Design a protein with these regions (language model features):
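Glycine/serine-rich phosphate-binding loop and adjoining beta1-alpha1 elements at the start
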Residues: 1-94
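Glycine-rich phosphate/diphosphate-binding loop of Rossmann-like nucleotide-binding domains
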Residues: 68-173
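Short, well-ordered alpha-helix to beta-strand connector turns
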Residues: 24, 174-175
């Protein structure tokens, strides 16, 4: 049993897929198991967000010699991850959380569990805080149309060539990116 990541035809997995075919191995790519509305039934995104956020704070603590956290794999679940994180004292950092998908929302569970204050994009970019804060951004927060129009996500996905990155404004004030 393994997550093959072959349906997207990534070049680095080509040899793996060829070996599976040569050996006549029965393969179910879990990314293709969907319901009647074509929504994936198996996904690990939420857990990737939970563990990724925890590991981000673990790395932050190590890098700045602030605290040491156990590896996520040695703990029993999300509640224990949050309990360990809440024991730490964070400086007044500003955290950018990108996305509202499964990974982003899993990471948000950690931030909210730690009782880190969520702020608006405008406030994040313009204010200083005396506590750790985070902002959750989506594609139109960090991309803008070249012609200056303000449209919607559908336009962004249909016409990505009409947009340029505006993420730099977050890098000027953020300490951590998740």
């Amino acid at each position: 049993f393994f997550f093959s990541h072959t349906i997207k035809k990534q070049p680095y997995n080509r040899k793996l897929l060829q070996a599976i075919l040569e050996k006549n191995i029965e393969l179910y790519d879990h990314e293709t198991i969907v319901d009647a509305t074509n929504r994936r039934l198996i996904g690990f995104g939420r857990y990737a967000g939970i563990v990724g956020a925890y590991n981000g704070f673990r790395a932050f603590g190590i890098k700045y010699d602030l605290f040491t956290l156990a590896k996520a794999e040695t703990l029993s679940g999300k509640d224990e991850l949050i309990t360990r994180l809440k024991r730490q004292t964070l400086p007044n950092i500003k955290i950018v959380l990108s996305g509202h998908g499964k990974v982003g929302m899993g990471a948000k569970e950690i931030l909210d569990g730690m009782k880190i204050k969520q702020v608006s994009v405008t406030d994040f970019l313009s204010k200083k805080y005396s506590e750790p804060v985070y902002v959750q951004i989506d594609v139109l927060d960090y991309n803008k149309r070249i012609d200056g129009q303000v449209l919607n996500n559908d336009d962004f996905y249909k016409n990505p060539q009409d947009y340029i990155s505006d993420f730099g404004r977050f890098t000027k004030v953020a300490d951590v990116y998740i």
